[in-house]
Amino acid sequence: MKNARLILVEDDPFTRATLGDALAMHGFDIRARVGNAFDAIEAQRTHDPQVALLDLDLGIGASGIDVAISLRKNNPNIGIVFLTTYKDPRLINSNIPNLPEGAIFLNKLEMNSTTKIAIQISLAIVKPLAKRALPWVRKGPLSSMSSTQIEILKDIAAGLSTSEIARTRGVSEQAIDKSIKRISKNLGIPKSTDSNLRVQIVRAYFENKGQGI
């Protein structure tokens, strides 16, 4: 949409600059490019944007989802678009709040042109509260995993041993072993030695973060 007021919330300076310039070329009025929650809320007060494009992971502090919820409280009709490498936001926080109604979730690795992003931003402006299916709910290896399994997946990726995970969670090592087997099954990892299984799980974790190793 030509001249639609947009704020860009992205903690990476290079992405913030290049993406902002590209969207300006598509006709959006880029009112602010900010890298944290505080500046995003201030930008909304100052510029009254029609839509916000946010990264999920903004580093230490509030997430993009937290920011979006605050933006929507201040303006119930603001369009919300998330653009991230994460295939499932629970990899940031397994207990994330629900996304604002009508939010559009885009994966950076699936967006091969800024035109596609611009189209989705326009949809968010025209129909900010439309019911939309979220991609991690309907597809992907993490879709059938519980929040607890997601947390154990993150613990494995952080290098914790089975005994350390069990101690942290106050359960038996056998219970953690069972969870690891379920996780590997959900991820489509074939049975193998424990060390190789962990390597495969860690690889899957980073792939789903959009940071393949």
Model-assigned labels for residue ranges:
Residues M1-R132:
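N-terminal regulatory/sensing modules of transcriptional regulators
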Residues M1-R5, V137, G210-I213:
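Non-catalytic signal-transmission and effector/linker regions of two-component phosphorelay proteins
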Residues E42, R167, K185:
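Alpha-helical residues within the helix-turn-helix
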Residues H47, S147, E151, K178, ...:
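Intrinsically disordered, low-complexity protein-interaction/activation regions
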Residues I60, S144-M145, D194:
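Residue-level marker of regulatory loop/turn positions in helix-turn-helix DNA-binding domains and
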Residues I121, I156, Y205:
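Hydrophobic "lid"/C-terminal helical patch
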Residues L134-K181:
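Helix-turn-helix DNA-binding segment
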Residues S184-I213:
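Basic, Lys/Arg-enriched C-terminal extension of HTH/homeodomain DNA-binding domains
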